[in-house]
Design a protein with these regions (language model features):
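N-terminal beta-strand motif that seeds the catalytic metal site of vicinal oxygen chelate
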Residues: 1-21, 30-33, 105-112, 162-199, ...
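Accessory recognition modules or surfaces
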Residues: 2-13, 17-20, 27, 33-72, ...
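Vicinal oxygen chelate
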Residues: 7-15, 63-66, 70-82, 84-86, 97-180, 221-226, 231-233, ...
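Conserved active-site tyrosine of GNAT-family acetyltransferases
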Residues: 20-25, 124, 197-202, 272
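Short, solvent-exposed secondary-structure junction/capping segments
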Residues: 29-30, 206
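A cross-kingdom feature marking solvent-exposed beta-strand/loop segments within repeated
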Residues: 36-62, 90-109, 127, 132-143, ...
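Beta-hairpin (beta-strand-turn-beta-strand) motif
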Residues: 81, 88-91, 113-115, 237, ...
């Protein structure tokens, strides 16, 4: 499981979509590329099930396919990574709204395309993960969310492989002249106990790429897991002055950063500083940029030279 997954997007829940999109574009990091394209059309009946709370209370709706779609999401193209920015009203009514009320804005799910959505979903269910959202058309799953929040407080969302329309849309976004030539590396997930979190995600089918080790520059110990083509870094803060400790104290466990490999780290830092970015930590190997004002997420650049 996960070896043949393709990243679809990182899902950030916010209260102000435009503010989040503007932040990344103003800093020269991301380009607002509009909502995601429609799922492939198939005539028939759709079914939508979702938890009204994080812990349950499911509801089911049925609909005829082909009706109008109210696009609410925005998307920021950051390098070759798509960041979905979805506005929600904090409070009761849907599990994501409750998540937003408890933690504030932030990335709460990672969406992948998989050639075996039914088999992969079954694997998660067998490991005790609840199916908190499931959309089907004529009985076939087109999108779901699985509750993998036990460690790391992040959910996994699965979709079937993208069709040519969506693939072309993504390729066109990446060719925009303002999109940075950044290569998406992965996400950093702050956790209370790196060892326990590692064991949990290995049981879910993630692959261990680097054992737990320390970074004194960041004030953390962390390990690298691989899921699909991306790194899933579990980060346990060890220093009180670490920015990752700040993230943990404010929001608890969860995705704290998005990381990208860049060819010229010094040049990228200079460009971002000229646009008003705040540099938190930098070495010859990486730089940490503070973009928590909208979305509670840091950008980390890795020297790929």
């Amino acid at each position: 499981m996960s070896d043949d997954w393709t990243l679809n997007h990182l899902g950030m829940m916010v209260t102000d979509k435009n503010a989040a999109l503007n932040q990344f574009q103003t800093l020269g990091m991301g380009v607002s590329v509009g909502p995601q394209p429609l799922q492939p059309y198939e005539e028939g009946v759709g079914e939508l099930m979702y938890f009204q709370t994080l812990d349950g209370d499911p509801v089911i709706h049925h609909y005829k396919t082909g009706g109008p779609h109210n696009f609410r999401d925005g998307n920021s193209q950051i390098g070759d990574c798509q960041l979905e920015v979805y506005p929600m009203k904090p409070g009761p009514g849907m599990f994501i709204s409750e998540y937003l009320e408890k933690k504030g804005p932030g990335i709460n799910h990672i969406a992948f395309n998989t050639p075996d959505i039914e088999g992969d979903t079954k694997r998660f269910l067998e490991n005790g993960c609840n199916l908190v959202f499931n959309a089907t058309v004529n009985g076939k799953t087109i999108e779901n969310y699985l509750d993998t929040r036990k460690y790391g407080d992040v959910m996994i969302s699965l979709r079937p492989p993208a069709d040519e329309w969506e693939i072309t849309w993504r390729e066109n976004n990446r060719l925009h002249p303002l999109v940075k030539n950044w290569k998406f590396f992965g996400v950093g997930v702050v956790v209370e106990d790196c060892a326990l979190a590692t064991e949990y995600f290995l049981n879910l089918g993630f692959t261990l790429k680097k054992e737990i080790h320390e970074s004194r520059d960041l004030g953390v110990k962390f390990c690298h897991l691989k899921v699909g083509s991306m790194m899933f870094e579990l980060i346990q803060p060890t220093a009180d002055n670490s920015v990752y400790k700040e993230c943990f104290n404010k929001r608890g466990e969860g995705i704290a950063d998005i990381s990208f490999a860049v060819e010229d780290l010094s040049s990228e830092i200079g460009s971002l500083l000229e646009k008003g970015a705040e540099l938190l930590v930098s070495t010859n190997e990486f730089a940490v940029i503070d973009t928590r004002r909208e979305g509670n997420t840091i950008i980390r650049l890795l020297n790929n030279a």
